[in-house]
Amino acid sequence: HGATPVVEYDGFEYDLAGKKFSELPEELQSAISQYRFSVQCLENYTMQEAESLFFNINSGVALSAVQKSKAKMGTDLIQFFSGLLEGMFFTQAIHITEAQARREDDLLMLLQSALLLDNRHDGLEYKTISAAYCLAYAESIKGSYTEEKREILREAVRFLDAAFPAKNKFLRKNNVPVVAVMARVAQEQGVTPDRFRGFINDFASQEHPAYDEASGSGNVKARSVQMRLRMMFLAFCGYFGLEAGAVGKPFADTVLLDEGTQAAEP
């Protein structure tokens, strides 16, 4: 690679940038050729055993919580979520830093979106959408994430793929799960992807003090997430001339639209 820095080997420095293997000094070619990988073949392992082994092998490595969730959720769900992450939205549109990419925060955002959609459609309770909580969520849906739930998430992501063909500064980690839920609301109201993108751009250009406050410290707590959902939902209804009370709320029925907090127990 052209950006490869100078390396030191056996007391000498070598410039490797932009060179092929055949262009390297003989001593480096020899050192590389003599390197051996330790490969172990595990036969007759079930997928559950392989997933457990992966988690245990990496438990001593500094993996992020969401990376550990890949071992917890199982092969089937990994394949499902990985397929959704290959679309335009998660590969081109979201605003993600290099460090976030290394932690696989795109998967975290997708898990957060799935969790919030589960809350909206099935009343799944949650206290936070932190990475650690999403790790537990990933384990809890293993073997129980129905085709109906998959289709809801799949349709929302496809809608986002169509709505955002290029990078959008608003699509940061804090906002993506909220936008994903609102994409589902937009679908239900017959809003096209292009018009939805117009709404998001308009929302991003306006001042929303309550939304901004809920995006600060503690932004992964349920109350803050619900406040952001509430503010974007009300802005959505105003933008498209919809009566908020006649549109499906972006969260479970146990959350009050006029408060953005959990309803009191009767």
Task: List the model feature ranges, each with a label.
Residues 110-266:
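C-terminal subdomains that position terminal phosphate/3'-OH groups for nucleotidyl transfer/ligation
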Residues 1-128, 252-257, 261-265:
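Basic- and aromatic-enriched surface patches that contact anionic nucleotides/nucleic acids
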